[in-house]
Amino acid sequence: MSIFIGGAWPYANGSLHLGHIASLLPGDILARYYRAKGENVLYVSGSDCNGTPIAIRAKQEGVTAKEIANKYHEEFERCFRNLGFTYDCYTRTDSEHHHETVQNVFLRLLEEGHIYKKTVEQAYCETCTQFLPDRYVEGVCPHCHEEARGDQCDACSAILDPLDLLEKKCKLCGSTPSIQETEHFYFALHTFQEQIKRAVEIAKQTGTWRDNAIQLTERYVKEGLLDRAVSRDLPIGVPIPVEGYEDKKIYVWIEAVTGYYSASKHWAEETGKDDREFWDGEAKTYYVHGKDNIPFHSVIWPAVLLGIGEGTIPRHIVSNEYLTVEKRKLSTSKNWAVWVPDILERYDPDSIRYFLIVNAPENRDTDFSWREFIYSHNSELLGAYGNFVNRTLKFIEKYYGGIMPKGSIDVELKDKIERLYKHVGEAIEQTKFKVALESIFDAVRFANKYFDERQPWKEREDDPVSCEETIYNCVYLIANFANLLEPFLPFSSERIRNTLSIVNRNWEPQHTLPSRIDSVQPLFERIDVKQIECELEKLYGAVK
């Protein structure tokens, strides 16, 4: 089976925060799991280097947009690598390859009659002497009356046009823009109304889209899909490939999602492999992103794919809700966030991954608190999992000189592990990652109970053969926990694999155990709870 996984493209205008990772982490879990299953996986993403936020940041700092994009693209790559993300292709939207692919898609839509020209009114700033792209206009949402940008309201998820906003202001200078006529290209989104409606109905029946994606898309369909501009007067981006319109750029909402397609083509060119199987309609596709990106993946990207006759409507939409920090909404402008480069300097990446999965905002907003993060590490990763691994392997090191005791796998344990693989695999495929991880840790707690009840420290004196059986089965559990947890906690799983000399990485019960255990090291270190206050002081002290 061919599995295509697309992770949303973060804007290269500032550092990643934990909210980004909470929404993107499911993609890596899926990729690791399906590779272990032996499926053909293509997992892509990249940095959005063409968006208005980059141009605004560059203007504020007095540098070029390219300098801003380069800085954060490199930082993103480093962060994703250090968190264990296993993209097959992580690229950027300002590459020549991406520009060519997007222009080809634009021309195909134009040739098929899905794009047309239209004279429209647009916000124009007399002070800055330029037409204002959507994100250059800010004001009040006409639907919920919260602060909003000209392209979308984060509060109610409404897709907006800058002219819809109340109390419009130019983001660059703060002045009130005038309204002037200009010509732009439009995408005939309304012609895909019935196909998108059918896609939502199927998703509702199969449960393959998150509830928030179903509800929001149903709302758009009920209101009637409106044609959307596909060109804008932007300072950076992909030029319109039509004579006389080269100064205009392809609007980022259609250009950025086409990044999945361009990244796929780039991967094919770089590896010499064929990517067509990921777009032939038979592939299982997963699109992983935050709630704010739902309409781009449930309406716009499907319409583009239908318009060019390529691929299928996204089968799985994995759209997490929002992550708050200490019960407050994340705010990058106020510096109310936990920044990824910062937290990676001091904490184990598996600790970060564990907390963001077990507290994932899968169906509702969830909160990151330093207290819960540190207690979660100490009680679950160290106290439950690390403790079971360490005391088992240290027992072998101390009483058997590192030589693996002889034994046979207990039938009940074998059955339990086989059922666990099936249950966890099904949960991952259904994008229920929290359920999957909690199931494994339920088994870890069972393993600790098994160790305590068998009391190998007593068995060693009273019944040496029974003691060997106990320890042998504990190692069997450890080997399989490492395998089951690899999609979630890859770094600690790799350390266990090395200690146990495990070579097989397939998604199946591990029955081959080592003959010897070498270099037993603690799987996790305890985090001093005093760090909670230190981190809170740092967080509150940095607020703007």
Curated annotation (Swiss-Prot):
ATP binds at residue 332. It catalyses: tRNA(Met) + L-methionine + ATP = L-methionyl-tRNA(Met) + AMP + diphosphate. The keyword Cytoplasm applies. Transmembrane segments: none annotated. Keywords: Aminoacyl-tRNA synthetase, ATP-binding, Cytoplasm, Ligase, Metal-binding, Nucleotide-binding, Protein biosynthesis, Zinc. Its EC number is 6.1.1.10. It is found in: Cytoplasm. One of its GO terms (biological process) is methionyl-tRNA aminoacylation. Binds 1 zinc ion per subunit. A motif ('HIGH' region) lies at residues 10-20. Its main location: cytoplasm. The keyword Lipid metabolism does not apply. Zn(2+) binds at residues 141, 144, 153, 156. GO terms for cellular component: cytosol. One of its GO terms (molecular function) is metal ion binding. A motif ('KMSKS' region) lies at residues 329-333. Its cofactor is Zn(2+). HAMAP family: Met_tRNA_synth_type1. Belongs to the class-I aminoacyl-tRNA synthetase family. MetG type 1 subfamily. Is required not only for elongation of protein synthesis but also for the initiation of all mRNA translation through initiator tRNA(fMet) aminoacylation. Monomer. This is Methionine--tRNA ligase 1. It comes from Bacillus thuringiensis subsp. konkukian (strain 97-27).
